[in-house]
Structure formats: structure tokens, C-alpha cells
């Protein structure tokens, strides 16, 4: 019994414990539930707030996007409106242009219609005229056939011949008119070009004198120079080959001659005769010989001075003499020695710029015209003559080629030859450096002397009186008195064949025989 009571007590205790535990758990669960509900409410409240915030932000973003889209749409709409307005303006302009063109086309159509109408009327009149003309032609043809007794074909042939003759005549007149007009236009254009060239040309004009003046102590000396019956003046002219002009010029005698060497010899000889006072043929011959020696010395000194000025050394003495003779030569009014020195310096300057041998360039420039120092008895161009002389006196092959090629007698194959060509052209083309008139005059006198000396038996020939007379000195042993007349005619004939000159030229053949004996 007691055991049962114990088990009941235990069971009751377990039951009470279980009920108490259940109540405790329930209370704890209720507390937890309340806490969970509170937390759920708090989370829900926070979520609601965040949702509201997100909704508001979304609405704000939506409004911003709508605003941006609206702004972009409005901008695009404005641009589209502007483009549409521009297109509309262009369309309006195009429409106006089309309207104008349509109006023009309509006007042209109307004008063409009127023209076509006028042309139709004219065509009708022309056809009518053609019919009338055909009828008149038939009538005239029939009448002509009756009057002339010619058939249609014969009349047609004569008419064709007449028309052809008239056409040829008209064509010739037209050609002549065209030629005259072309010539007139060419002359006018040439005058314009020449006038323009003269206006633009500003060079100096320096003439090389062909006369020398010898002062006299008094006018009485003129009579002594002339001598009895003119024997002294004839002796001077015969010995020197120049003209002595004794006129009213007070206390002066003019020496005229195109050869500067002979003119200088005559000047020195005349000054020596005037200073000595003894003037007669034998004394004249001595003075001329002494003056010739003095001029030869001056020529040598001029050549040496030129080589010294240019800075060129080791030149053969004969070439130095040729260089000195250039002092008494001119080319188109330009002194050839000064021209050669100028060419030498120009060659040196250009050679220095190109980096080639300056000394060699100066040497070629100085020697390029030595062929002009040789008298006209030597045939050939001065470039070839100069090259042959340079080769003869030991100049190098480059120098020889430069001399021969500076006037295209040989094709330039070296830089040095081209340099000499360029320097020669620069010096000669300088405004005022050269003049054509004197050179042409001198060339004519040289040709006269060349023709005179080309005949056998001639010892000397001098062109005097400005080329209106040549004096031919012949050897008395080779040419007789009778042959001298024939020689004069032969010289005159050759001058007529080879030269063009105004007026006439006197050929004076002089044959002199001297007999000399000494009394002891």
C-alpha cells in the first residue's frame, strides 16, 4: 500500500513537474513569441520605411529620367524643327528656282515658236525666191545661148573658169592682207619688246676708242710731220699701218686705226719724233722700230702683271706674251685682257664654292682667250687656236680642254670646262661690258686685211680710212709692176664676193724698190 502511495506520489510529483515545466515553457514561449513579434514588427516597420525610401528614390529617378528624356526629346524636336525649317527653306528656294526656270523655258518656248514661225515664213519666201530665181536663170540661160551660140555645158565651163579665177584672185588678196596684218602685228610686238628691253636695261655704255691723240708743242709741228709733199706722213702711215689725221684741232694729231698695237706703236714713234725734232723717212723708220720694241716690252710686262694679279705662276714665257697682247685686243668693245682677268677671278670664286682646284680654275680662266692674241693669218676659231697654243707650251690636258670647249668647239666633259663657259658668259653678259658696233667695224677691217694678205707676194696689208681703203705692200722680187695691177683687180673681186659694205673700197697696191749703198 505504501509502495503504491509512493509510486502515486512520484507520479503526482512527475505530473506536477511536467505541468509546471509545461507552464514555464509556455510562459517562456509566450515571452519569446512576444519578443519575436516585437522584432518582427520592428523589422516590418524598418522594411516599410526602407520600401518607402526606395519607392521615393525610384519615383525621383523616374522623374529625373522622364525630365532628361523630355529635355532630350525637346532638344531633338528643336533640331528637327530647325532641320525641317531649313529643308522647307531649301524646298521653297528650289521651288522658286524651278518656277523661274519654268518661266524661262516657257519664254524660250514662246520665243522658239515665234522664231519657228518667222523661219517658216522666211523659208516660204526663200522657196518662192528660188522658184523665181530658177525661172530667171532658165530665161537668162536660154537668152545667153541664143546670143552667144553656146550650149549649157560650154557656158557652165566658162563660168566655172571665171569663178575659179576670181576665187584665186580673192584668195591671193586675202593671203596678202593676212600677211600684211601679221607683219604689222609682228613689227608692233617687236617694237614693244625692244622698248621694254631698253626701258629695263640700265647698264653702263663704255666704248673702246679706235683713235689716239698725240699732243704737239705748237701747230708748226704739223707741217714738219706732213713733210715735203706729204712724204713724212706717208712714211709714218706705211710703216705703222695707221691713219694720221691732221686737221684744225689745235696742237694735236689724231692717230686712227682699229689695231691697238699698231696704234700704240705709232703713238710712241710720233711722240719720240716730236721730242727729237728730226722728222724724215729714215728717222721715222728708226722711231717705229724702237717703238715696236717698247710695245713688245710693254706687252710682256702686261702679261706678267696679269699673272701676278690673278696669282697664277709657272706659265710659259710665250703664253705670257700672248696674255700681254690681249691688252691691245677688244671683243665687242670689251678689253680682252681685263675680260680674261675677270673670268679668272670668277672661275676661282665658283671653284672655291664647288670645292675644286682654285688655282687650276684661275689658270684656265686667264688663258681661255689667248687665241684672240694671234693675228688673223692663223685660221680657226680663237678657242681652238688657244687650245693648240696651250698644248704646244705644256699646259695640262684639263686646261687645254677647257680652252677648246668654252665656245662649244668641243663638248664640255669636265667641271672646269663648264666653269670657264659660265664665267665667260657672266663677264661678257654684264650690262655695259660689251658693245656690238665697234666689234663689227673692227671685224670688217680685219676681213679686209685677211683678204689682202691671202695673195702670194703680199708682205703687209693695212686697212685705213675706216675701211674705205686698203694698202697692200708687195715684194718687188715676187710681184712686177704689171702684176700689181692684176693683183689689185683680184683683191677687189674677192672683196666684192666675200663682203658686204657701203660705198666703195680703194685697193692701193704699193711696190717699193730700195737701192742702198754705203760711201766709205
Swiss-Prot record:
Lineage of the organism: Bacteria, Pseudomonadati, Thermodesulfobacteriota, Desulfuromonadia, Desulfuromonadales
A GO CC term assigned to this protein in UniProt: plasma membrane
Protein encoded by which gene: rny
Intrachain disulfide bonds: none
Main location (coarse class): membrane
PANTHER family attached to this UniProt entry: RIBONUCLEASE Y (PTHR12826:SF15)
Family, similarity comment: Belongs to the RNase Y family.
Parts forming coiled coils: none
Mode of membrane association: Single-pass membrane protein
Protein's recorded name: Ribonuclease Y
Amino acid at each position: 500500500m505504501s509502495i503504491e502511495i509512493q509510486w502515486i506520489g512520484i507520479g503526482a510529483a512527475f505530473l506536477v513537474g511536467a505541468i509546471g515545466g509545461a507552464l514555464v515553457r509556455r510562459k517562456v514561449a509566450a515571452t519569446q513569441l512576444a519578443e519575436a513579434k516585437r522584432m518582427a514588427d520592428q523589422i516590418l516597420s524598418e522594411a516599410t520605411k526602407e520600401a518607402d525610401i526606395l519607392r521615393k528614390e525610384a519615383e525621383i529617378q523616374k522623374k529625373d529620367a522622364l525630365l532628361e528624356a523630355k529635355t532630350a526629346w525637346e532638344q531633338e524636336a528643336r533640331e528637327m524643327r530647325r532641320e525641317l525649317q531649313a529643308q522647307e527653306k531649301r524646298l521653297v528656294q528650289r521651288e522658286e528656282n524651278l518656277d523661274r526656270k519654268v518661266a524661262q523655258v516657257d519664254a524660250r518656248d514662246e520665243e522658239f515658236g515665234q522664231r519657228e514661225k518667222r523661219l517658216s515664213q522666211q523659208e516660204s519666201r526663200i522657196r518662192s525666191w528660188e522658184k523665181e530665181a530658177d525661172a530667171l536663170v532658165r530665161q537668162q540661160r536660154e537668152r545667153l545661148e541664143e546670143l552667144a551660140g553656146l550650149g549649157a555645158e560650154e557656158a557652165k565651163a566658162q563660168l566655172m573658169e571665171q569663178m575659179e579665177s576670181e576665187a584665186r584672185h580673192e584668195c591671193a588678196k586675202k593671203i596678202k592682207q593676212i600677211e600684211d596684218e601679221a607683219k604689222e602685228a609682228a613689227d608692233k610686238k617687236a617694237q614693244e619688246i625692244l622698248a621694254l628691253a631698253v626701258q629695263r636695261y640700265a647698264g653702263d655704255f663704255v666704248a673702246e676708242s679706235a683713235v689716239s691723240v698725240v699732243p704737239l708743242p705748237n701747230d708748226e709741228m704739223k707741217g714738219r710731220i706732213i713733210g715735203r709733199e706729204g712724204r713724212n706722213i706717208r712714211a709714218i702711215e706705211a710703216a705703222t699701218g695707221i691713219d694720221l689725221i691732221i686737221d684744225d684741232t689745235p696742237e694735236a694729231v689724231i692717230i686712227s686705226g682699229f689695231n691697238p698695237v699698231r696704234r700704240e706703236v705709232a703713238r710712241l714713234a710720233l711722240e719720240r719724233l716730236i721730242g727729237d725734232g728730226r722728222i724724215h723717212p729714215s728717222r721715222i723708220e728708226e722711231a717705229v722700230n724702237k717703238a715696236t720694241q717698247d710695245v713688245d716690252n710693254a706687252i710682256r710686262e702686261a702679261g706678267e702683271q696679269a699673272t701676278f694679279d690673278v696669282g697664277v705662276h709657272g706659265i710659259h714665257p710665250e703664253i705670257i706674251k700672248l696674255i700681254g697682247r690681249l691688252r691691245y685686243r677688244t671683243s665687242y668693245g670689251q678689253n680682252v685682257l681685263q675680260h680674261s682677268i675677270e673670268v679668272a677671278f670668277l672661275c676661282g670664286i665658283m671653284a672655291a664654292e664647288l670645292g675644286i682646284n682654285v688655282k687650276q680654275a684661275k689658270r684656265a680662266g686667264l688663258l681661255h682667250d689667248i687665241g684672240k692674241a694671234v693675228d688673223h693669218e692663223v685660221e680657226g676659231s680663237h678657242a681652238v687656236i688657244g687650245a693648240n697654243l696651250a698644248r704646244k707650251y705644256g699646259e695640262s690636258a684639263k686646261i687645254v680642254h677647257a680652252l677648246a670647249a668654252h665656245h662649244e668647239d668641243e663638248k664640255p666633259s669636265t667641271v672646269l670646262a663648264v666653269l670657264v663657259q659660265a664665267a665667260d658668259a657672266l663677264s661678257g653678259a654684264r650690262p655695259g661690258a660689251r658693245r656690238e658696233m665697234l666689234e663689227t667695224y673692227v671685224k670688217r677691217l680685219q676681213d679686209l686685211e685677211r683678204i689682202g694678205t691671202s695673195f702670194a707676194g703680199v708682205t703687209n696689208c693695212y686697212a685705213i680710212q675706216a675701211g674705205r681703203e686698203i694698202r697692200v705692200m708687195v715684194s718687188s722680187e715676187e710681184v712686177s709692176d704689171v702684176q700689181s695691177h692684176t693683183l689689185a683687180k683680184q683683191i677687189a673681186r674677192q672683196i666684192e664676193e666675200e663682203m658686204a659694205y657701203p660705198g666703195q673700197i680703194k685697193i692701193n697696191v704699193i711696190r717699193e724698190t730700195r737701192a742702198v749703198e754705203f760711201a766709205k
